[in-house]
């Protein structure tokens, strides 16, 4: 099982073996010294070159590696710790703790390369995953075991929504979450850890980080590390898990780097020729089974805002819902800044949601769309030139817009107002009332930053006083 390093080209390392040939994806361990410090490096077999030579991808920096160093094939792929002990801790791609906390003995390890659940075990039920966030549950609901794309520029609130979802899953569904930082900025990973600590959600989430400064192997495989931890919660503990990936684009990007390093001929826009199959293999593992489910929320960076770029276009094929954050909405002070007209979901179907929910959702969208169409007239001629019917539409649309805002639990520290979880029934009832004109006499301000409609009524009473 011992081999010798024969070539080092940055993150690509060739290893020669005599009487043993490691399988593709098998892990190889190397110990070496740099400036008197002993380092352990894991390599993953990517190609067989013939003559018992394998080409591997390094999972960490390869500085200090030299030809002739001894390498040991481990006989199995990279395996990472799983189970409840991983909660509240930060791991790197090979499952080592990197949070400088106390050491833990993990009794269970799973390989990061796994097959998706067989068809007969997969659940075919279309169920809604209640998040407690009004705008999401009403207009672009998430599917249990589905995949959601979270689109938004910098500073619009992607991280806050992710943290609120982790909070609501922990407290309402008493479920666990896994966060995979794929090609994240180290600063963002650090901020997220401290924000979670302050918001008291850390003990319900496992964090896996492969930062921007790490080699492509680590940035690519970190997504599999996180997914493996989530699969254990689903398959062995029968839980509904939430899996966050930030950012799924970096998964494709690091795959392209690895592909080029291995000498494969690039495909469109320089991406790897295996882009669609790599993404498919990964996304197929995120699914509902009869035991439990993994619902994933994936932040998607769109290079140069070009939605036809192969990387985001490949992700779209797998998504069940999209939550689009809009800077213009954030500038109005409406948080979460989810765009009610741009966000979509395949769950928005009367056969899944029921006629009532569907009608209210479509009614809300129709009113908001009409308001959007009237904005030019209002800007040029003012409100007085509108017909009575249009004035009423604008009035209701402005109330709906404000009622789509909501105080978050994880933002209590900044806003000073306590967070609210709104159940689906209360959510539908509130918006139905606005559409039916029940609350036409109430001031707009009563609907801003409240939970359910009863709170809006109480706020209106306060404003009167």
Curated annotation (Swiss-Prot):
InterPro entries: AAA+_ATPase, ATP-synt_VA_C, ATP_synth_F1_bsu, ATPase_a/bsu_AS, ATPase_alpha/beta_chains, ATPase_F1/V1/A1_a/bsu_N, ATPase_F1/V1/A1_a/bsu_N_sf, ATPase_F1/V1/A1_a/bsu_nucl-bd. Its main location: membrane. PANTHER family: ATP SYNTHASE, ATP SYNTHASE SUBUNIT BETA, MITOCHONDRIAL. Keywords: ATP synthesis, ATP-binding, Cell inner membrane, Cell membrane, CF(1), Hydrogen ion transport, Ion transport, Membrane, Nucleotide-binding, Translocase, Transport. Produces ATP from ADP in the presence of a proton gradient across the membrane. The catalytic sites are hosted primarily by the beta subunits. This is ATP synthase subunit beta. It is a peripheral membrane protein. The keyword Translocase applies. The gene is atpD. Belongs to the ATPase alpha/beta chains family. SUPFAM superfamilies: C-terminal domain of alpha and beta subunits of F1 ATP synthase, N-terminal domain of alpha and beta subunits of F1 ATP synthase, P-loop containing nucleoside triphosphate hydrolases.
């Amino acid at each position: 099982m011992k081999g010798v390093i024969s070539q080092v080209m940055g993150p690509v390392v060739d290893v020669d073996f005599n009487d043993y040939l490691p399988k593709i994806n098998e892990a190889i361990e190397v110990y070496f010294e740099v400036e008197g410090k002993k380092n352990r490096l894991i390599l993953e077999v990517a190609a067989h070159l013939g003559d018992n030579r394998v080409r591997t991808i390094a999972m960490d920096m390869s500085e200090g590696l030299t030809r002739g160093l001894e390498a040991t094939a481990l006989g199995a792929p990279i395996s990472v710790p799983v189970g409840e002990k991983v909660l509240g801790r930060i791991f790197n791609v090979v499952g080592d703790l990197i949070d400088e906390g106390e050491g833990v003995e993990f009794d269970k390890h799973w390989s990061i390369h796994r097959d998706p659940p067989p068809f007969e075990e997969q659940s075919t039920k279309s169920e809604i995953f209640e998040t407690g966030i009004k705008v999401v549950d009403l207009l672009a609901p998430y599917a249990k075991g589905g995949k959601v794309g979270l689109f938004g520029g910098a500073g619009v609130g992607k991280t806050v929504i992710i943290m609120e979802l982790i909070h609501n899953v922990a407290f309402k569904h008493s479920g666990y979450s896994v966060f995979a930082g794929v090609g994240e900025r180290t600063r963002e990973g650090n901020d997220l850890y401290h924000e979670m600590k302050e918001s008291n959600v850390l003990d319900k989430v496992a964090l896996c980080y492969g930062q921007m400064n790490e080699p492509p192997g680590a940035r690519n495989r970190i997504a599999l590390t996180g997914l493996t931890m989530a699969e254990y919660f689903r398959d062995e503990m029968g839980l509904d898990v939430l899996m966050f990936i930030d950012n799924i684009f970096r998964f494709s990007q690091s795959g392209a780097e690895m592909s080029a390093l291995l000498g494969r001929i690039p495909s469109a826009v320089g991406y790897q020729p295996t882009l669609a199959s790599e993404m498919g293999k990964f996304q197929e593992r995120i699914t509902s089974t009869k035991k439990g489910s993994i619902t994933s929320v994936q932040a998607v960076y769109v290079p140069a805002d070009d939605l036809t770029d192969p990387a985001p276009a490949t992700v779209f094929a797998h998504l069940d819902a999209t939550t689009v954050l809009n800077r213009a909405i954030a500038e109005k002070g409406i948080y979460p800044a989810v765009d009610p007209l741009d966000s979509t979901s395949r769950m928005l179907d009367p056969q899944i949601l029921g006629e009532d929910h569907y009608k209210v959702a479509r009614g809300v969208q129709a009113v908001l769309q009409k308001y959007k169409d009237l904005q030019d007239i209002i800007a040029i001629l003012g409100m007085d030139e509108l017909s009575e019917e249009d004035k009423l539409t604008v009035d209701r649309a402005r109330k709906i817009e404000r009622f789509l805002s909501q105080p978050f639990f994880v933002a209590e520290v900044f806003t000073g107002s306590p967070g609210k979880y709104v159940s689906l029934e209360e959510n539908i009832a509130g918006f139905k009332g606005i559409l039916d004109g029940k609350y036409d006499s109430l001031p707009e301000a009563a609907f801003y930053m409240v939970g359910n409609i009863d709170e809006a009524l109480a706020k209106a009473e306060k404003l009167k006083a």
